[in-house]
Regions:
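Residue-level signature of the C-terminal ends
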Residues: 24, 43, 65-68, 104, ...
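Amphipathic alpha-helical elements of HEAT/ARM-like alpha-solenoid repeat scaffolds that form extended
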Residues: 14-18, 55-62, 114, 118, ...
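Alpha-helix boundary/N-cap detector
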Residues: 24, 28-31, 53, 88, ...
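Short terminal alpha-helical segments
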Residues: 1-47
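Amphipathic protein-protein interaction modules
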Residues: 57-114
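Charge-rich, solvent-exposed alpha-helical interaction surfaces
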Residues: 20, 32, 36, 76, ...
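Low-complexity intrinsically disordered segments
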Residues: 93-141
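Short, well-structured hydrophobic secondary-structure segments
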Residues: 35-67
């Protein structure tokens, strides 16, 4: 049975991506997430939903590592993040995570957003991205 929900970890693409991250040696995990963030941030045209989904999951995983107490209770939060958080001293990783979460809720050239909006869940995914932004210390105001 697949996972499907508006939270950053509540879908199969996100969970599969984070499983791939977890399977890497700890020192390579941030690089894998940074790669997913960069794909979205460097995109000059339409971003497909699975690509955005991986980037959002990676950004939220960084946020959960920055502020584990605030992210507790988030549906499908990978258990390994509590025991093996991502490095939070990497300001580039944190800032790019913020940028991706902001980009995710913009409709321009963004299939991920379009699908949520068509399903009537745009407000829900906006709230989940804002929650993850708050974990990163950004209120997004």
């Amino acid at each position: 049975m697949g996972a499907t929900g508006s939270g950053p970890f509540e879908n199969d693409d996100a969970l599969d991506f984070l499983d791939e991250v977890h399977d890497l040696p700890r020192q390579d995990r941030a690089g894998k997430i940074l790669g997913a963030l960069d794909v979205v941030l460097r995109a000059t045209d339409y971003v497909e939903a699975p690509v955005m989904c991986e980037a959002v999951a990676g950004a939220a995983a960084v946020g959960a590592s920055v502020n584990p107490a605030a992210s507790q209770g988030e549906p499908y939060l990978p258990e390994w993040l509590a025991a093996e958080p991502l490095p939070t001293g990497d300001e580039e990783l944190v800032e790019k995570s913020r940028q991706v979460l902001r980009r995710a809720v913009r409709s321009h050239d963004n299939e991920w957003w379009e699908l949520w909006e068509e399903a009537g869940l745009g407000a829900d995914v906006t709230a989940s991205c804002r929650r993850a932004l708050a974990w990163l210390g950004d209120r997004d105001d």
